[in-house]
């Protein structure tokens, strides 16, 4: 992966896989630490995960979980419709938005120098999350 990132140094890089690095309960997935480090070294912008049946958006952060402008933003979007997991009582460090109240999808738009996101809830639910962010 690091070699692929090195020969494709474009802005607004997005990566995705199943289990999130940072999770609602404050745990981290050690299995993804190599990927997150390689992506951070390459200046990637976004990680998109599922697995947890909830929605979370984290501030850009380093592989160590320290918020910073040069970090990677993680979205956990496991809200496809099977069931919903409850949220832990305390938001994990750097969590900016989270919900387990609605099924829905995340619309991501990658621009040449920025990206936009918008969580679209199922009919009848009011949770929403949207924004834009510049690329590194």
PLM feature segments, named:
Residues 64-136:
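Binuclear metal-dependent phosphoesterase catalytic core
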Residues 1-73, 135:
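His/acidic metal-ligating clusters that form di-metal
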């Amino acid at each position: 992966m690091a070699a692929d990132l090195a020969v494709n140094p474009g802005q607004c890089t997005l990566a995705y896989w199943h289990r999130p690095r940072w999770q609602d309960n404050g745990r981290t997935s050690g299995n993804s630490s190599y990927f997150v480090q390689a992506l951070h070294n390459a200046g990637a912008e976004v990680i998109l995960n599922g697995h947890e049946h909830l929605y979370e958006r984290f501030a850009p952060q380093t592989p160590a979980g320290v918020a910073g402008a040069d970090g990677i933003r993680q979205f956990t979007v496991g809200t496809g419709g099977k069931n919903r997991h409850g949220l832990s009582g305390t938001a994990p460090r750097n969590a900016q938005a989270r919900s387990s109240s609605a099924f829905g999808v995340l619309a991501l738009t990658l621009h040449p120098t920025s990206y936009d996101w918008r969580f679209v809830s199922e009919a009848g639910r009011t949770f929403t999350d949207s924004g834009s962010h510049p690329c590194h």
